[in-house]
């Protein structure tokens, strides 16, 4: 009620003359009822009425007591928002509630004020602008998500800064502006689904290319504007470079932005993952990407053994395989300039992952240094290259080892024996990952027990 916005809102109150007179009479009647219902107040009025004997005032009803403001506008000036949370019979003014409740009330007040104000505007193009700094402060997660819905319903331009993954988890990622410091300079990045650039003289080759790939490239010869509507690949990059002749710097910028375009499927995959992870990945300083849940369980423990901590280092782990593919995350990291390291299996699927990263426009040098392949086919087999971890494998699946598997070991067929043990572990990957952690809690690994590829990945994001 002390907010300037509240005062502006109250000034918008409009009551007709007839209704105002009726209210005025009701208020006067209420005031008179209050006075006459109490003997002490009546006696006080009678005593004060004697003032005319001293001051020589003329007329009747010289003295009265205003128990309530007698003017409607005086009454409105004392209006305030009161809230009862339902647990008591008391109504408390909004300024006696917590910061979170006050913030929500202020935003909803703005919502109502904007609606009234815009209805009074004669220009159809009139639009309000709402700027909010960390509206999630002092609110629990469910309240933050509910607040986001209320803000989203406000019909105006909204500029909001937030540090809450809960606030952004249901937003359209294309509305996101990602702000970060880079070498002392503030950088702002965004996700886009097309890239538009102008060319002073559109080459014939580009026009022919747009005819052949109309789903990707659109040319407006009248405005000399080229629109790339879908992410390009290496082949299309070569074709664009071949038919355009601006400076190398200009064409490089065009190609770089064309690789950063997100198609609808990629945006849907990212939206789904952000909702699952509560948007946490967008606040991380670095990403460690891996294929499955087993890595999600075990890699933080490996980091601890190496004297590192993912949370302290600002690292978010991302399971890319169960959320579409690696490509959208590699592209998002490029768009937002988030450093990353990716782990991939050394199999056909792993090679497919490398191809997805390559199609995001990364150089071969970046791919070879940031996409780390297991020396074996997958995570469980890679862990089995460590003698200590393989021994632990045997311990956690001991009840499932059959006589046939034991005979493989006794006959000296070590490779086949290891394969069978790994298969048993893989039958319950996640459960067995937790069994390993439980085992290691009493008998910790050493850094030498961790396969080299995971040491390199962890140090790559934590240093």
Residue ranges and their predicted role:
Residues 5, 47, 106-109, 146-150, ...:
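Alpha-helical scaffold elements adjacent to nucleotide-binding pockets in ATP/GTP-utilizing enzyme cores
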Residues 39, 43, 100-102, 142, ...:
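Generic recognition of stable, solvent-exposed alpha-helical segments in well-folded globular domains
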Residues 67, 162-164, 329:
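Short beta-alpha junctions and helix-cap segments that line functional grooves
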Residues 77, 100-101, 125, 153-155, ...:
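Short, well-ordered loop/turn elements at secondary-structure boundaries
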Residues 207-289, 293-463:
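Acidic, Mg2+-coordinating catalytic modules of nucleic-acid enzymes
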